[in-house]
Amino acid sequence: MDKATIQAHKISDEEYEEILKILGREPNLLELGIFSAMWSEHCSYKSSKKYLNGFPTKAPWVIQGPGENAGVIDVGDGVAAVFKMESHNHPSFIEPFQGAATGVGGILRDVFTMGARVVANMNSLRFGEIRGESELAKKHRYLLKGSVAGIGHYGNCMGIPTIGGETTFDPSFNGNILINAFALGLCKSDEIFYGKAEGVGNPVIYVGSKTGRDGLGGAVMASDSFNDENKSLRPTVQVGDPFAEKLLMEACLELFKKDYIIGIQDMGAAGLTSSSFEMAGRSGSGMKMYLDRVPMREVGMTPYELMLSESQERMLICAKKGFEQKVLEIFRKWDLDAEIIGEVTSSGVMQLYWHDELAGEIPIGPLSEAAPVLDRPVARPKYLDEIANLEIPNNIDNKTAFFKLLKEPEVLNKSFIYDQYDANIQTNTIKQPGCLGAATIRIKESGRAIAMAAQCDPRANFVDPKIGAARAVAAAGRKVAMSGAVPLAITDCLNYGNPQNPEVMWQFKEGCEGIKEACRELNTPVVSGNVSLYNDTDGISVYPTPAIVTVGVNEDANLNLKSTFSSEGRAIYLLGETSGEFAASLYAKALFNVVGGKLKEVDYKAERALWELVIEANKEQILEFANSVGVGGLAITLAKMASISNIGVNCEVKFKEPNFIFDESFSRAVVGVKDEAKFEALATKFGVKFEKIGVSGGKRFKLNEIDESLEDVREIYLNEFAKIVKKED
């Protein structure tokens, strides 16, 4: 094998030596391509696996933790919630519409392949600078519009509501955008399907769309940095067909009602290669596959292309022997391709045939369960010492600061985005995009509700990767708790830069430690997740962005707690300690272009007490609303609530310094109280600091010296974002 071919497959010299040992010979091109895909960062997690070990993954309500297509938790009454978050960062930067659309398609397959009907989508999106007339801003407006259109197109065509998410902007994402997709489905807790292939002689069946050349090398592309040489990689981006996926989902759900199969796996990154090796690897089995039987969309396709294509809307099934025709009939009824392409063996080896000739033979273990794990060098970044001392002037009046922060893209209402998503299809949505807080759906059969919230502050993770990651877990959980639901588990999408940079690996290591700590302390285990590395361009990495989605359950869907005002004259209370924390704050960034300071550790006792107080007060029906205090502090939190509800506020709060209305002290919330005496007694019992700061009502936004027309505040908050994004329209 010539060196140029090996290098083109991103195989290091050490890895090639290991391949020679495994095979006992030189690999052919097909085998090299398979090793390249399965040992890519995207498939093998070779740089991250060391630090993922030790994540809390167990609890009485956890049915399936990491290692399968998606995580599964018990949500009561014999119902299970199946959910996961995935990234499609690199493809979306190259071709935003198809990249984002197929990201949605992939996460949907991960969920419904477990036997669940998907009932909710969410997303977590990061873009660079979108304001102004620079070519960079124009590019990111294009990326934003394309990605959002792709997400909406796929979800809407599938008939699945997109009910929430988060979108933020920072120059650190100028060279790499982050597109993270989340899906949640429901099924019976005793009817879950797994990605395994076992039982010698059991047939292996290919179902779904035909295989083409789209997406070739996608897994390897997603495991590399961007530079001037590889920015035009459109052929590596898959092309999605949501209508084909809708048929595939319905066919799979029909199949799951029968006892015909052993296991089923989505063909995601690395296509037929990853699905076959993962299914056999989990079971310790071997497999024979006859690649000339694979349904092909293009003529002249080779075994190499068939194994590595990432054509969408495809699944691999291990059926029970004797039931293969029943399986084929179901998929053909739905007008999908379905062919028997192989069988399970006991050899522990993958044997690939092309017109009855052996084209490739590889042991399965070293490419699946026993894939290499790297111990990359780590080094604490030098920049941390440079940014540790945050000094910001106190020379800007609060009115000026208020409007400056209100106009920041990450603050502004994102109706331009979520209006492209159908949030109400399936008629289960209780709380949808634009309402603040956790998104919520009802489980009609049980009367319960599932709340879910996405959260991550990249600036906080840049300033302190461990505390920042812990805060993401806590903040996502708090949003769920503020809806009245009990947070139960998380899924994560860990977006970091180039792992070959020791400082990036240190950020990743610290981020994992923060997640472990927070999940243990808050009793929200990790049940699924994804790692996306190489989010860097020309040596510049994105801010560490460990996106978290927390899922929780409210025993009574009728007690879902709102996040905004719904009446006038309601007492408003601020819960938690305000200590003047401006580290990594929007105030420091927007007004002084400074990102730095020292984050305070998460006070888990205070965080848990806040959750428990609001959940209990909601059960006693003494709250009208509850909302987490987040970016921009109390002032921006109240401005959002007033704008959405079209109800003013009149608040006066005694802080040490006037600008503390913008501070981002952690573990705080704003609540509307119906019975003040009862609530204050309850808050005292739980040990949560409280202060009555005002009332809702009127058409003014009043907070200390800020006294503005609510109409003016609403005009900015509700309409400014669309004006920014639509500049070229």
Curated annotation (Swiss-Prot):
Q: In which pathway is this protein known to take part?
A: Purine metabolism; IMP biosynthesis via de novo pathway; 5-amino-1-(5-phospho-D-ribosyl)imidazole from N(2)-formyl-N(1)-(5-phospho-D-ribosyl)glycinamide: step 1/2
- The keyword Nucleotide-binding is assigned to this record: yes
| Binding positions (ATP) | 45, 84, 492, 529
Query: Which Gene3D superfamilies does UniProt cross-reference here?
Result: PurM-like C-terminal domain, PurM-like, N-terminal domain
Reactions mediated catalytically: N(2)-formyl-N(1)-(5-phospho-beta-D-ribosyl)glycinamide + L-glutamine + ATP + H2O = 2-formamido-N(1)-(5-O-phospho-beta-D-ribosyl)acetamidine + L-glutamate + ADP + phosphate + H(+)
Q: Which residues bind substrate?
A: 87-90, 109, 238, 310-312, 532
Which residue stretches, if any, does this entry annotate as coiled coil?
Answer: none
InterPro entries assigned to the protein according to its UniProt record, in alphabetical order: PRibForGlyAmidine_synth_PurL (IPR010074), PurL_linker (IPR041609), PurM-like_C_dom (IPR010918), PurM-like_C_sf (IPR036676), PurM-like_N (IPR016188), PurM-like_N_sf (IPR036921)
Where located? Cytoplasm
Q: Where does Mg(2+) 1 bind?
A: 86, 530
- What family, per the record? Belongs to the FGAMS family.
Designated name of the protein: Phosphoribosylformylglycinamidine synthase subunit PurL
Q: Which gene encodes it?
A: purL
